[in-house]
A protein has these predicted regions:
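Low-complexity, glycine/alanine/valine/leucine- and proline-rich hydrophobic stretches
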Residues: 150-159, 167-169, 179, 183-186
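Short, charged alpha-helical interaction segments and adjacent helix-coil junctions
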Residues: 2-20, 24, 28, 86-91, ...
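Accessory alpha/beta interaction modules
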Residues: 1-159, 172-174, 227
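Short, well-ordered beta-strand micro-motif
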Residues: 130, 165-167
Length: 275
């Protein structure tokens, strides 16, 4: 890449070239895929191994306030035909305690969906599906179901909350593994997920959708840039630079220049970013 161009300065072919490298695992791309309720339903039917489940409501970037009034944004929150809730999260980097993130999300959804004056037995079931590029439990399975078990008896007990961890690292020839392959290499149309792959190709080829994706990426990048300038922290700037390289296809030098990193500090940033 020889220099940074704003979306308004790019030709359609340049936009298509940029979008061609995006995958379903990328935050903004995943968000656009989940705006289609039928696509969300297709994905969940494969992961939950339930071909009859129906998604009644699907909200990408669902915002829920915690007890302190701070808004937490979920990647997508769905409600099915049985009134059960399902939060789907996608994660590329192994950089946090993901099990605690799942626990936190489930608690927020339970608080959000519990109506005042109702008995606990009326609390809706909550499922969190955590999709990652890495194997959270490092046990060579493409999918893990986490159950509550009584230690003394080995009995499985239910409280309406469940967790499923799916990863794209382990290839085991299952339907879930095949779906995950498409999440990380989102090109062409895939028989196992026709609705998802059709929508992917629409956003990678059609002028309106290609431009929309590019503009969303630019908006996210500019918001991150302002955040980095306001914070003034080197660690935050490094994270944003890495995002520019990974998600926007910028060279490391162009990303540093965009973040207004002095020329004499670029090598230090490169070393700390490990790029």
């Amino acid at each position: 890449m020889t220099g940074y161009k704003r979306v308004s300065e790019m030709t359609l072919e340049e936009k298509r070239e940029k979008v061609a490298g995006f995958n379903v695992m990328d935050d903004v791309f995943f968000q656009k895929m989940m705006e289609d309720k039928e696509v969300c339903e297709e994905i969940l039917r494969i992961i939950l191994e339930n071909s009859k489940m129906r998604v009644i409501e699907c909200v990408p970037q669902a915002s829920i306030k915690n007890l302190n009034g701070k808004s937490v944004v979920l990647d997508v929150l769905c409600r099915d035909n049985d009134g059960k809730y399902c939060n789907v999260e996608v994660q590329k980097a192994d950089d946090d305690d993901h099990q605690k993130r799942v626990r936190y999300n489930a608690a927020l959804i339970s608080m959000y969906t519990m109506q005042a004056g109702k008995d606990y037995k009326e609390l809706p079931d909550v499922k969190v599906v955590f999709i990652s590029q890495f194997d959270v439990f490092k046990a060579d399975h493409a999918m893990y179901h986490v159950d509550r078990v009584v230690r003394e008896t080995g009995q499985k007990v239910e409280n309406g909350q469940s967790e499923i961890y799916v990863n794209a690292k382990v290839k085991d020839q299952t339907s879930v593994s095949e779906l995950m392959e498409y999440f990380t290499d989102s090109n062409g149309r895939k028989e196992i997920c026709p609705k998802l792959s059709n929508r992917v190709m629409m956003f990678k080829t059609e002028q309106k959708e290609v431009t929309e994706i590019c503009e969303l990426m630019e908006k996210e990048r500019l918001a991150g840039w302002e955040e980095g300038k306001e914070e003034g922290k080197q660690g935050e700037r490094i994270r944003l630079i890495v995002n520019l390289v990974d998600k926007m296809g910028m060279s490391f030098e162009d990303a540093c220049r965009f973040m207004e990193i002095p020329q004499e500090e670029i090598e230090e940033y490169r070393r700390k970013a490990k790029l």
